[in-house]
Amino acid sequence: TLFRSDTVNLGSRLEGITRQYGVALLVSQETARLAQGIVFREIDFVRVKGKDIPIQIYEPLALTSEADATTLAQLKTWEQALAAYRAQQWDEAERLLKKLKDVEPDVRLYDIFLQRVADYRLDPPGADWDGVKKFDSK
């Protein structure tokens, strides 16, 4: 009999969506909270297959001691872009995402959110939108 704890199951789900965001590693909010000496970027608020409760997911960017000024500035701009996105402030989110892309043109995350902004402009999510991205596959 194979027993898979909730933590192992979540880890497996996160591994499955990591490549969709174009990042090397994703961790849960709990892991990011417990890790010391690492700078994390919040990536998204997701509901993975088999879980009812959405979770925030993070990407480790650098050791705190090695994070340079550009990384920290980009992180701050990303946090502002994510806040604007979640507040359905599409123009501001787009402006900030384009600013991020100017510095890091190959970061897929920015393209993903620019596409979401474009999609939500055409088909707004509504006032009760919680910002959660649902993943139905493993």
Indicate residue ranges for each PLM-predicted region.
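Short, small-residue-biased leader/transition segments that mark boundaries at the very start
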Residues: T1-L2
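Intrinsically disordered, low-complexity, charge-biased linker/tail regions
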Residues: G126-K138
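Cytosolic regulatory/linker segments at or just downstream of nucleotide-handling modules
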Residues: G11, T18-E92, K98-L100, E104-L109, ...
